[in-house]
């Protein structure tokens, strides 16, 4: 999810409706659509973990506590990965790095950071690595669905111009309207499909770790297909394929280390 330096209007028209960058105000403080929907996604994802934990052989409270603890490195990692990938922009204005009013988070970094730190947390709470990350898959995909709605309202993660039948008139993060590939909706659809597949695997009693592995491969495949449709970001540090390869390598390594560290 990315956003450029200029601040576009808080409300954008879309046909007869409006796309709201700012959903509401709390004591004069504007609450942006992306952070608000991300928060809703995290809350819903937390309760999804609480619901599926027994089906994965985990105690509800232990799984919920681990999820809450790992939210912190996940959010920080998602932001850090994005900033490093766009360092050419952020190095000129360091105050923007942790500015909550703008977007800029990457799932890659969040998952890698949380995976790397999870063995310590899970061992302390007596949770199995594979079972927990199967449950966390539901949390992440649920959060992703809400976050992509936030991206759509905010205009970030926009698609590039489309002259084909696959396209909607949408704004980018600067408020420029044109017919684009609806990248946010495509990612939302991918998350729904992966979430449905994960539910099916849980229902048939798939081996522990299978849900996480299948979702990871499915997400990587979806990104390979969708990323070429995105609006090219300005002065990005690394290619998207390179970033995806690094993400898969780091995730695989962290998963192996976590599995061995917990012994299960």
Question: For each predicted feature, which ranges?
Answer:
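Hydrophobic, membrane-interfacing alpha helices
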Residues: 3-264
């Amino acid at each position: 999810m990315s956003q450029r330096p200029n601040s576009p209007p808080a409300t954008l028209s879309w046909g007869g409706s409006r796309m709201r960058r700012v959903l509401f105000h709390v004591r004069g403080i504007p609450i942006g659509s992306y952070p608000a929907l991300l928060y809703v996604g995290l809350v819903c994802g937390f309760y999804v973990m609480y619901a599926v934990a027994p089906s994965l052989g985990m105690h509800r409270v232990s799984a919920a506590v681990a999820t809450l603890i790992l939210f912190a490195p996940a959010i920080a990692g998602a932001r850090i990965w994005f900033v490093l990938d766009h360092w050419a922009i952020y190095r000129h204005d360091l105050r923007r790095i942790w500015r909550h009013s703008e977007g800029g988070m990457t799932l890659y970094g969040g998952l890698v950071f949380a995976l790397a730190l999870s063995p310590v947390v899970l061992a302390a709470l007596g949770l199995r690595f594979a079972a927990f990350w199967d449950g966390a898959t539901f949390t992440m995909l649920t959060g992703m669905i809400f976050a992509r709605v936030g991206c759509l309202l905010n205009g970030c993660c926009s698609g590039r111009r489309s002259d084909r039948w696959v396209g909607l008139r949408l704004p980018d993060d600067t408020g420029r309207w044109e017919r684009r590939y609806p990248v946010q909706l495509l990612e939302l659809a991918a998350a729904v499909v992966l979430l449905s597949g994960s539910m099916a695997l849980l229902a048939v009693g798939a081996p522990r770790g299978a849900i996480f592995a299948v979702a990871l491969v499915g997400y990587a495949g979806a990104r390979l297909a969708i990323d070429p449709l995105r609006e090219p970001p300005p002065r990005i540090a690394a290619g998207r394929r390179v970033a995806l390869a690094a993400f898969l390598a780091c995730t695989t390594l962290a998963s192996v280390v976590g599995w061995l560290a917990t012994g299960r």
